[in-house]
Amino acid sequence: KGQIFIDMLSHPTIRKFIDMLLGEDYLLSSHSANIVKPGSVAMRLHTDQWWMPTPTRRERQPLPAGSMNRERFDVDEVPSTMIAPRVAANVLWVLEPFSEDNGGTLIVPGSHLYGRQPDSDAASVVATAPEGTALVLDGRTWHGTGANVSDGTRQAILTTFCTPQFRPQENYCLGTDESVLAKAGPDLLALFGYKIWNAYGRIESPMAEFVRPDEDIVRELYPDQ
């Protein structure tokens, strides 16, 4: 809600990290404030790509991917040496210092390679950081907001990106103001989901590079037309 938040999306250092983690094409999944108030309890450990099906045995019948939700995952009882690829990445912009007392983010180091959903009793560490820090996480990392037992708030901005095969948390094609779209360049339009990816997301021609909300579409045709 403002140019400063749009400018954050083109921060060169951050974008280099996201390019490295996700590749040439990716979408903005969410871009929002995270304010932890005094008395807030710790969040349950989670990943930012919990919806990603995990590898399973050929002879096993897995839970259909469309039946997964935040409380119901597919779990193969036989451990696998294979893990799901990284398809999401998260940026935590530290607006107020992160500490052990004010809700600094809890992280389980190395958990991005575990290949499973978080254990509730996993040992975590607090990502302490000064104001002005940006913390970049692999989307598979087990993490969660810590408890705020201090007298002050802990403010941050959370920005999540995902690869174009997946559905973003926020629908920027419908939720972006026209004034923002009118000034948006190719990079921002691609982040918002207006770029056609390998013929996916098109309205008419799969050869077009971008779609626009005001694009003319072919409507019902009649024999006399």
Q: How should these model regions be labeled?
A:
Residues 112-136, 140-141, 146-225:
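Conserved double-stranded beta-helix
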Residues 3-10, 84, 127-128, 150:
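Aromatic-acidic/polar surface patches that form glycan- and anion
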Residues 1-69:
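Non-heme Fe(II)-dependent double-stranded beta-helix
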Residues 37, 95-97, 161-163:
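Non-catalytic surface loops within mature trypsin-like serine protease
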Residues 31-33, 91-93, 157-161:
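A structural signal for short, well-ordered beta-strand segments
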